[in-house]
Structures are given as structure tokens and as C-alpha cells.
Amino acid sequence: MRFMMIVKATTDSEAGTLPSQELIDAMQKYNEELVKAGVLLAADGLQPSSSGIRISYPEPGSKAKVIDGPFTEAKEMIAGYTLIEVKTREEAIEWALRMPDPHGFGQGEIELRQVYEVEDLMGNPESLAKEAVLRRQVEEQKKA
């Protein structure tokens, strides 16, 4: 089962304040532990919402609306994420609890969410087969 550890933004991360070298070192050590355990799939930090773009669909069937950042409510923003694959929900919680304070200022907040697997969403064998083809193509593109 896959889980995403969503690192919530703070006013500092939204202002573009970069983490200290001490925090970078702590996060690198943590990521090394995830790699050694064979559970890390991806981990990235995100730029502030001021460089972001939001696409909204104000009404069903209407044209999409493009909105440039910055966006309000830093607590609702995401500053980064770590994607892991583990055997149990409890293991995901254990890894999330081991993550250093993601901002280093005592403001860190991590939201842990389980990722839907393709099988959870697509019960139709034809849809599953099409999805498998797409995933193989993505893997082949990564190798090229």
C-alpha cells in the first residue's frame, strides 16, 4: 500500500524561505533511511504558491479557469511530499513520525494519506488492462 506524507506549507515556506542546512541534512538522512528500507518512491519540495497555477472548474461543463498564484491560507497549501510503499497503515504512521520537523521552526505539519491503487478505482478488466499498458509506457519512457 502506498501512502503520501503531505508536508503542509507555512508562512515561511510560502515566503520562499529555504530550509537551513541542518534541516536539509536531517531530511537527507531520513530519506536515506527510507531508501535503505526499500519504501521510498518519491520525495520532493514544492516552490511557494506564488509560482503556482490553479486550474478550477467553476461549474459543471464550463471552461476551465486558470488562476496564477499566490494563493491564500498557507495552512491549506502543500510545501512538499514523500511517497512511500509499505505493508501496513501502522508502518506508514511510524515512518511519518520519524520525519524531522519539515520546516525546522516548530510549525511543521504532515498529513498522511493512503493512495488509491488502480484496482481500487477500476473494477472493469478492460480499464485495468489499458491502465497497465499506460504504466508500462511510462516506465519505458523513464528508461529512454
What are these regions (language model features)?
Residues 1-144:
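Conserved, structured core segments of small domains
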